[in-house]
Amino acid sequence: MRVCRTLKISIKSFPSSLSLLSLYKRRLHKSTSHSSTATSSHYSKNNLPSDSPDLLFDYFIDGHKIHVNPNAVEPLHLRRNADVVGFSLPHGVKQSFENYIQKYPLSDQVENSSNIYDPSSPPDSPRKQQTHLGTIPPEHPDVFFHNLKKKLDSLHTHSSPLTVYRNHLLTCETDSALAQLFKSEIYQQLSDFRRDFPLSHALRDTMLIARLNFLNPMLALSFFQAVKKHSPNAYVRGCSAPVYNQAILSVWQGCKDPNFVLHLLGEMRENVVMRDSETREAINIVYKDVNEWPKQLLFSQNRILEKLKIFLLP
């Protein structure tokens, strides 16, 4: 009887099920809004290095700096299907294709010359408005890039395996599709010693697409870790200096952990992976950011800066 009385009192002390449900919904709404705000700000373009040493691939680089839009908060790849009707491409691919076509024109490019400069057009014509990569935007991008995609697909039989893989990379519309492509085309082939495939170039491009195109640096880092831990042969073939550069930039873009960056640089030194100019640019980005942090934020700031200086030496 005493136990029942105690239970009756404790039940009365709790709020009703309706108030519990409303309280749960209120807390769920707060946590959801907080997480979405944090995610959008974390993966915004503002967190990307403004002087990133690469664009998409080696043959897409033309020396122009990337101008970051300071007002962009939501990642553009979340709404990439809104501006193209009938055909969708990952964010960032259009400008890279423009640059690619300008450097490597196709045989029938003159017939479909929507991006060729026309001096007879008026000064305010969109065809005279240069993009920040120095190329003329096409008048009908949906049709232009749809036809271009068909042309690239038709060139597969005349292209190297790396070019074919790069074209497959550009067709990935989600990071999950990119992960599936990595699993089928790279990871499952790591045990094939006879396969004549430039593994380091393919891994570097896959990490770069994950890091810049889908703003998922942790996915890029997982690609690196999968190849590194697979076997000594896979590590030697795949983990070159450009791949380590992408790993360093992925760590800094994703979590800004200077100790992790130092760990990767130490791996390069121990395994005699020679640093290149891109490595020094990545270290300079890390050094500049750490040097601007408040002193109370990182107690070992001076020690980390001294170690980064050592890796900056030739």
Curated annotation (Swiss-Prot):
InterPro entries: Mtf2-like_C, Mtf2/C5D6.12-like. GO terms for cellular component: mitochondrial matrix; mitochondrion. Residues 111-136 are annotated as: Disordered. Disruption phenotype: Decreases the association of cox1, but not cob1, mRNA with the mitochondrial small ribosomal subunit. Signal peptide: none annotated. Pfam families: Mtf2. GO terms for biological process: mitochondrial translation; mitochondrial translational initiation; positive regulation of mitochondrial translation; RNA splicing, via transesterification reactions with guanosine as nucleophile. One of its GO terms (molecular function) is translation regulator activity. Component of the MRH5C complex, composed of mrh5, ppr4, mtf2, and sls1. Proteins mtf2 and sls1 form a subcomplex that serves as a scaffold to bring mrh5 and ppr4 together. The MRH5C complex associates with the small subunit of the mitochondrial ribosome. Translation activation factor that as part of the MRH5C complex specifically recruits cox1 mRNA to the mitochondrial ribosome for translation initiation. This is Mitochondrial translation factor 2. It comes from Schizosaccharomyces pombe (strain 972 / ATCC 24843).
